[in-house]
Design a protein with these regions (language model features):
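Glycine-rich phosphate-binding loop of ATP-dependent small-molecule kinases
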Residues: 1-188
Length: 188
């Protein structure tokens, strides 16, 4: 049974929305580096302040910071029955690190869901979300920079997981419900 997953997709592809549904369906917790970082930023920790500066410029938080958060979370009891990783890994180094941590735990990923979306549609989605949620990291220049960073650093993960025969490619351009129906059919 599928219990350890990663969800990939450009910023604004709907990863968080679909992650919640997948977690409910499979009865597993979500593992979100974005949520962990937002909590650190809200608490005003040193890590949170540094992360906020980088995120507001549209850059990724360095692997060294993320990796220490990820390792302690993956080794916690909360994720021992499975998880859905949302926002991690974002590059090949992080994927190798995650594989290593899971190997230490005598387990591995079961599947990787990739939400494939039209990038211009994503810009529109994110600008709309920025208005609704008042997110400082969703200005148009920052969005375009995040998409560029995604393309350069994160897209190689699609190839990596395809070669590992873990990739489930999903057309993410439909409605929330159409995308969800596609995901459900692939997971069953």
């Amino acid at each position: 049974m599928i219990k350890r997953l990663v969800i990939l997709g450009a910023p604004g592809a709907g990863k968080g929305t679909q992650a919640r549904r997948i977690c409910e369906l499979l009865d597993i917790p979500t593992f979100s580096t974005g949520a962990m970082l937002r909590a650190q930023m809200q608490e005003g920790t040193e890590l949170g302040i540094k992360a906020k500066e980088l995120i507001n410029r549209g850059e990724l938080v360095p692997d060294s910071i993320i990796s220490s958060l990820v390792e302690s979370e993956l080794k916690s009891e909360r994720f021992s029955r499975g998880f859905l990783a949302d926002g991690y890994p974002r590059n090949l180094e992080q994927a190798h690190f995650m594989d290593s941590v899971l190997k230490d735990l005598d387990t591995q990923l079961d599947a990787v869901i990739n939400l494939d979306v039209d990038l211009e549609d994503v810009v529109g989605r994110l600008l709309k979300r920025a208005e609704i949620e008042h997110r400082s990291d969703d200005t148009e220049p920052v969005i375009r920079r995040r998409l560029q960073v995604y393309h350069e650093q994160t897209e190689p993960l699609v190839r990596y997981y395809r070669e590992a025969k873990l990739l489930i490619n999903i057309d993410g351009n439909g409605s929330i419900y159409q995308v969800w129906d596609c995901i459900k059919s692939k997971l069953s």
